[in-house]
């Protein structure tokens, strides 16, 4: 599995590759992708879940039980539950987010899709998101999925990353450049 441009570590990439191949063999790629996206969302929203994932103080079995309880509540597939259990027993939960990113990146690559990571100063309307997706699709010549995050510290505008390319049209960056230019004048 190529990890170039995905920011996925070697450890996470190996686990992601193993899960991808297993899901492919079981013809469960779509279900596994949905389950992993849900897990990623849960980890982003729950500080308690992030503590379980990152805590070196919890035993392997405690981490595995906690993760299994969470996954059972949201009704994810047995494949993902077994995978997360294995990751917990191997003390690798700290890399779970990278494993999820690696799996989803490989699935997108196999489907001829690219993921644009967009950070905007404020939430985009559905119309704005559709226009951005369409513009990126035309510029890149392939299907594009947009991973949108909001960061008010940008002040205005957005930062778009696709693979190793980045377009930064944020007000924060423009102000920083102006500040540096003004320092050079005086």
From Swiss-Prot:
A cellular-component GO term for this protein: plasma membrane
Pfam families: OSCP
UniProt keyword list: ATP synthesis, Cell inner membrane, Cell membrane, CF(1), Hydrogen ion transport, Ion transport, Membrane, Transport
Compartment(s) where it occurs, according to its Swiss-Prot or TrEMBL record: Cell inner membrane
Classification via PROSITE patterns: ATPASE_DELTA
Highest taxon, organism lineage: Bacteria
Transmembrane portions of the chain: none
GO molecular function list: proton-transporting ATP synthase activity, rotational mechanism
Membrane topology: Peripheral membrane protein
Family membership: Belongs to the ATPase delta chain family.
Role description: F(1)F(0) ATP synthase produces ATP from ADP in the presence of a proton or sodium gradient. F-type ATPases consist of two structural domains, F(1) containing the extramembraneous catalytic core and F(0) containing the membrane proton channel, linked together by a central stalk and a peripheral stalk. During catalysis, ATP synthesis in the catalytic domain of F(1) is coupled via a rotary mechanism of the central stalk subunits to proton translocation.
Protein's recorded name: ATP synthase subunit delta
Gene name as annotated: atpH
């Amino acid at each position: 599995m190529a990890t170039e441009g995905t920011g996925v570590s070697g450890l996470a990439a190996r686990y992601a590759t193993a899960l991808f191949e297993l899901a492919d063999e079981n013809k469960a790629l779509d279900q596994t992708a949905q389950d992993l996206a849900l897990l990623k969302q849960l980890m982003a929203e729950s500080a308690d879940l992030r503590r379980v994932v990152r805590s070196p103080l919890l035993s392997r079995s405690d981490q595995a039980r906690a993760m299994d309880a969470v996954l059972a509540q949201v009704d994810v597939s047995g494949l993902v539950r077994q995978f997360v259990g294995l990751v917990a027993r191997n003390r690798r939960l700290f890399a779970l987010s990278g494993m999820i990113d690696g799996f989803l990146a490989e699935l997108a690559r196999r489907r001829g899709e690219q993921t644009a990571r967009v950070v905007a100063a404020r939430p985009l309307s559905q119309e704005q998101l559709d226009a951005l997706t369409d513009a990126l699709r035309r510029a890149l010549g392939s299907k594009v999925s947009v991973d949108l995050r909001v960061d008010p510290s940008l002040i205005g505008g957005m930062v778009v990353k696709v693979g190793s390319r980045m377009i930064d049209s944020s007000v924060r960056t423009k102000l920083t450049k102006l500040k540096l230019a003004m320092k050079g004048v005086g």
